[in-house]
């Protein structure tokens, strides 16, 4: 049994070439059972969304393009996506529009949901241009400390921090809490 994963990519006035890199990386995932919902929210300018709509068509049936107007910022867009999520989905994965995943992302992390007590899996992250300068290398070192030490300690105490991107959530758990909280401008601060 390979769980169906619905990947949600919210975007607000994101540069098309940046979002295109994200979507192309998602098209190369080595996981057979997923969809990608691209949620362009509150962005009326065609410059931002028209090339992405075309790219989603080119990438095939796994990619669903939506251009919506909603309230609640990113969380509102993610909640709207829940209405379009494939009924087979067991896991929701969220990736920001400017992230690039490696092909084994899902195949490596989805098995963690075999434990029915697992509701959230937070993947570590780095800056893709972390080797371009000392400042960016330092930012990656900061991330490494957070993920390699802090998150491991939190996991042992069942007190994980959701970063808002590179996160996977069991859909039934998400629905149990009523979706993403829209009371704050950033959905991962609640």
Residue ranges and their predicted role:
Residues 15-19, 48, 70-78:
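Phosphate/oxyanion-binding active-site loops and adjacent basic polyanion-contact surfaces
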Residues 56-60, 65-90, 103-185:
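Long helical/loop segments within the catalytic core of UDP-sugar-dependent glycosyltransferases
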Residues 7, 36-38, 120:
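Hydrophobic/aromatic residues located in beta-strands of well-ordered beta-sheets
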Residues 23-33:
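Short, acidic, metal-binding catalytic loop of nucleotide-sugar glycosyltransferases
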Residues 1-24:
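N-proximal low-complexity "stem/linker" segments adjacent to membrane-targeting elements
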Residues 32, 40-52, 69-71:
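A conserved acidic beta->alpha catalytic loop
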Residues 4-6, 35, 190:
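Cell-envelope/extracellular polymer assembly enzymes that use nucleotide-activated donors
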């Amino acid at each position: 049994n390979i769980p169906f994963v619905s990947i949600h990519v919210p975007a607000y006035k994101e540069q098309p070439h940046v979002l295109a890199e994200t979507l192309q990386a998602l098209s190369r995932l080595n996981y057979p059972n997923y969809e990608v919902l691209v949620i362009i929210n509150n962005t009326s300018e065609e410059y931002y969304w028209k090339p992405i709509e075309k790219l989603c068509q080119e990438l095939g049936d796994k990619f669903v393009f939506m251009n919506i107007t909603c309230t609640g910022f990113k969380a509102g867009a993610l909640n709207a996506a829940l209405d379009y999520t494939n009924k087979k989905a067991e896991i929701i994965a969220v990736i920001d529009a400017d992230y690039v995943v490696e092909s084994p992302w899902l195949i490596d992390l989805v098995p963690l949901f075999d434990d029915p007590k697992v509701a959230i899996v937070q993947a570590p992250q780095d800056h893709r241009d972390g080797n371009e300068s000392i400042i960016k290398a330092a930012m990656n070192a900061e991330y490494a400390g957070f993920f390699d030490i802090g998150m491991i300690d939190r996991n042992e105490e069942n007190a994980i921090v959701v970063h808002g991107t590179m996160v996977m959530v069991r859909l039934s758990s998400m629905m149990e809490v009523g979706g993403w909280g829209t009371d704050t401008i950033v959905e991962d601060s609640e």
